[in-house]
From Swiss-Prot:
Residue ranges of LRR repeats: 100-122, 124-146, 148-170, 171-193, 194-215
Region (Disordered): 205-227
Self-association and partners: Interacts with the EF-Tu receptor EFR and FLS2 in a specific ligand-induced manner. Interacts with TMK4/BARK1. Interacts with ERECTA in a EPF2-induced manner. Interacts with ERL1 in a EPF1-induced manner. Interacts with TMM. Forms a complex with MIK2 in response to SCOOP12 perception.
Gene that encodes it: SERK4
Taxonomic source organism: Arabidopsis thaliana
Transmembrane annotation, as ranges: 235-255
Organism domain of life: Eukaryota
Reactions performed catalytically: L-seryl-[protein] + ATP = O-phospho-L-seryl-[protein] + ADP + H(+); L-threonyl-[protein] + ATP = O-phospho-L-threonyl-[protein] + ADP + H(+); L-tyrosyl-[protein] + ATP = O-phospho-L-tyrosyl-[protein] + ADP + H(+)
UniProt keywords, alphabetically: ATP-binding, Cell membrane, Glycoprotein, Kinase, Leucine-rich repeat, Membrane, Nucleotide-binding, Phosphoprotein, Receptor, Repeat, Serine/threonine-protein kinase, Signal, Transferase, Transmembrane, Transmembrane helix, Tyrosine-protein kinase
Protein's name according to its UniProt entry: Somatic embryogenesis receptor kinase 4
GO CC annotations on file: mitochondrion; plasma membrane
Enzyme class: transferase
The protein's Enzyme Commission number: 2.7.10.1, 2.7.11.1
Phosphotyrosine sites (modified residues): 468
Length: 620
């Protein structure tokens, strides 16, 4: 009996020590979790049914399993993404304990209170995005200690006081503090010298200093008699010269109006380098050298907006140079610069970052980073022999990434950007096959003399929404339609419009062909043969459901891109599809009961591996 009691006591002691060890481990390893728990306790959700903080369980050893939190391989928090999450409350000073944090994204919520000084302790921070909240108080001077900070958006809040001079020592690439209550002088030194008034608009700040006026010569005295005679003679000579010059001027004007494939250097292009915010203004000579005089061997693609050339800058970096073709109008240069800067302010992991531009009296050129893996279209249909096909996991990730990029354009840009030509050819892939939406903003840029929503229809056959084609009026739902067709390209590997399908008596429009195949319940015949059967049938079914929801004939019935993102993340696709089935069954005979797999969590597996690759809104 005594032996039995001894064993029981030993077991109890062991369990006690084990619990004590676990508690000690949790306390030691969960300092970051405690900081995030403080943030959770300070915030509340305006949508309790979809509370994004619901998974933030303080009893877990690490916060790395929480949704919207990303960790590095050492289980240190590197990203907190709570943008557009319907949260209210205040930020907490404990955030300063996240010493490995690189991205803090809290845009488009209803956060109040002040920005904690302790954020200045986040020495690894690259991006701080607090856009569109109700934050008040000053901009903390401690942010000047953030040597790695490159992206700072504090616009559309109620911040007051002066801009701290300490920020001028930070090498910012993107800055937006517009639409606040700031006062005082705008710093002009450091990185602030690169930013234009658009970054500071709608405050009570002192205007940027104007350049010194050009010196003027004193008024000359009235001419004497001899001078008058010389002036008359000079006038006669000038008139004669003008008589001969007029035909030459007319000929030059005619040449300029003709579309040319040649580039001419003019003195205006040798002006001192001009920066628009983080954009560089390249000289035409730089881009001629980079692209080998725009050699045809460097052409990456051709589209409705012009040709794209591969180039290598003097510093060795590869770029893609887009030569725009458009009709210039009076005053267009200033408007072009304004629109270019607005495009450059759209910064997101899934958007192609504009690096710079070149503007001359005859040319408009945009410079982008070079995307190593080309476009989705080229990977699907034009891949070099020996290169592997896009596997199914990559295609799923492309669907989600491109949706996030489009949602950002629609919901999080200060001026909503409608793409108007969403297709596989405009979804680019970086070195890691992350989807990057390209060519956004160009439709507006090329119509900068048009102040109305209705413009010439731009787009690609097979991707154009019916209401856009019939009325010329585009909206964000136009992009949703194009996105839905792009999903079908990902699934089938086929073009949106292909006359070759006539050989099999099939519809030339991909969307119509898919609907016909689905009526015959031949799902397997839809899937790209390049996948060689290596896909999950339930996942294909769900992506088709999403595509059909996005391509409904009625624009009002299509989901918003933000809703598409949520459904791809596993929230509401089954319900939305079932509702659509009840309404559209007579028209679209894709029987949901024939494909009974209802789960949607395939698109966001709840594992650290995918969370670590999730970069919702940082600069590229």
């Amino acid at each position: 009996m005594t032996s039995s009691k001894m064993e029981q006591r030993s077991l109890l002691c062991f369990l006690y020590l084990l619990l004590l060890f676990n508690f000690t481990l949790r306390v030691a390893g969960n300092a970051e979790g405690d900081a995030l728990t403080q943030l959770k306790n300070s915030l509340s959700s305006g949508d309790p049914a979809n509370n994004v903080l619901q998974s933030w369980d303080a009893t877990l050893v690490t916060p790395c399993t929480w949704f919207h939190v990303t960790c590095n391989p050492e289980n240190k928090v590197t990203r907190v993404d709570l943008g557009n999450a319907k949260l209210s409350g205040k930020l907490v000073p404990e955030l300063g304990q996240l010493l490995n944090l690189q991205y803090l994204e809290l845009y488009s919520n209803n956060i109040t209170g002040e920005i904690p000084e302790e954020l200045g302790d986040l020495v690894e921070l690259v991006s701080l995005d607090l856009y569109a909240n109700s934050i008040s108080g000053p901009i903390p001077s401690s942010l000047g200690k953030l040597g790695k900070l490159r992206f700072l958006r504090l616009n559309n809040n109620s911040l007051s006081g002066e801009i701290p001079m300490t920020l001028t020592s930070v090498q910012l690439q993107v800055l937006d503090i517009s639409n606040n209550r700031l006062s005082g002088d705008i710093p002009v030194n450091g990185s602030f010298s690169l930013f234009t008034p658009i970054s500071f608009a709608n405050n009570s700040l002192t205007d940027l200093p104007e350049p010194p006026p050009t010196s003027t010569s004193p008024t000359p005295p009235p001419p004497s008699g001899g001078q008058m005679t010389a002036a008359i003679a000079g006038g006669v000579a000038a008139g004669a010269a003008l008589l001969f010059a007029v035909p030459a001027i007319a000929f030059a004007w005619w040449l300029r109006r003709k579309p040319q494939d040649h580039f001419f250097d003019v003195p205006a292009e040798e002006d001192p380098e001009v920066h628009l915010g983080q954009l560089k203004r390249f000289t035409l000579r730089e881009l001629l050298v980079a692209t080998d005089n725009f050699s045809n061997k460097n052409v990456l693609g051709r589209g409705g907006f012009g040709k794209v050339y591969k180039g290598r800058l003097a510093d060795g970096n590869l770029v893609a140079v887009k030569r725009l073709k458009e009709e210039r109008t009076k005053g267009g240069e200033l408007q072009f610069q304004t629109e270019v800067e607005m495009i450059s302010m759209a910064v997101h992991r899934n958007l192609l970052r504009l690096r710079g531009f070149c503007m001359t009296p005859t040319e408009r050129l945009l410079v982008y980073p070079y995307m190593a893996n080309g476009s989705v279209a080229s990977c699907l249909r034009e891949r070099p022999e020996g290169n592997p096909a896009l596997d199914w996991p990559k295609r799923k990730h492309i669907a989600l990434g491109s949706a996030r990029g489009l949602a950002y354009l629609h919901d999080h840009c200060d001026q909503k950007i409608i793409h108007r030509d969403v297709k596989a050819a405009n979804i680019l892939l970086d070195e890691e096959f992350e989807a990057v939406v390209g060519d956004f903003g160009l439709a507006k840029l090329m119509n900068y003399n048009d102040s109305h929503v209705t413009t010439a229809v731009r787009g690609t056959i097979g991707h154009i929404a019916p209401e856009y084609l019939s009325t010329g009026k585009s909206s964000e739902k136009t992009d949703v339609f194009g996105y839905g067709v792009m999903l079908l390209e990902l699934i089938t590997g086929q073009k949106a419009f292909d006359l070759a399908r006539l050989a099999n008596d099939d519809d030339i429009m991909l969307l119509d062909w898919v609907k016909e195949v689905l009526k015959e319940k031949k799902l397997e015949s839809l899937v790209d043969a390049e996948l060689e059967g290596k896909y999950v049938e339930t996942e294909v079914e769900q992506l088709i459901q999403m595509a059909l929801l996005c391509t409904q004939s009625s624009a009002m019935e299509r989901p918003k891109m933000s809703e598409v993102v949520r459904m791809l993340e596993g929230d509401g696709l089954a319900e939305r599809w079932e509702e659509w089935q009840k309404e559209e069954m007579p028209i679209h005979d894709f029987n949901y009961q024939a494909y009974p797999h209802a789960g949607t969590d395939w698109l966001i597996p709840y594992s650290n591996s995918l969370i670590e690759n999730d970069y919702p809104s940082g600069p590229r």
